[in-house]
UniProtKB/Swiss-Prot annotation:
Family according to the record: Belongs to the Hfq family.
Protein known as: RNA-binding protein Hfq
Lineage of producing organism: Bacteria, Pseudomonadati, Pseudomonadota, Alphaproteobacteria, Hyphomicrobiales
GO cellular component: cytosol
Originating species: Brucella abortus (strain 2308)
Domain of life according to the entry: Bacteria
Annotated InterPro entries: Hfq (IPR005001), LSM_dom_sf (IPR010920), Sm (IPR047575)
């Protein structure tokens, strides 16, 4: 049977969400955001920092840099 595969973007965002890894997100206009992903969908990422949430649209994101290595697959060393 064929398994349903997840795309890399969803695997990455779900991993950093579950592991509560702090991220730096650079937007296409140069703005730098930091925080922890609390949720995401096809269009946006909910970022939390200092008790405040920010809804960031994915089309505005240029780069995402985690503050530590991300383990995306079971048994994989980060």
């Amino acid at each position: 049977m064929a398994e349903r595969s997840q795309n890399l973007q969803d695997l990455f965002l779900n991993s950093v969400r579950k592991q509560k890894i702090s991220l730096t997100i650079f937007l296409i206009n140069g703005v730098k955001l930091t925080g922890i992903v609390t949720s995401f969908d096809n269009f946006c990422v909910l970022l939390r920092r200092d008790g405040h949430s920010q809804l960031v649209y994915k089309h505005a994101i240029s780069t995402i840099m985690p503050s530590q290595p991300v383990q995306m697959f079971e048994g994989e060393e980060a």
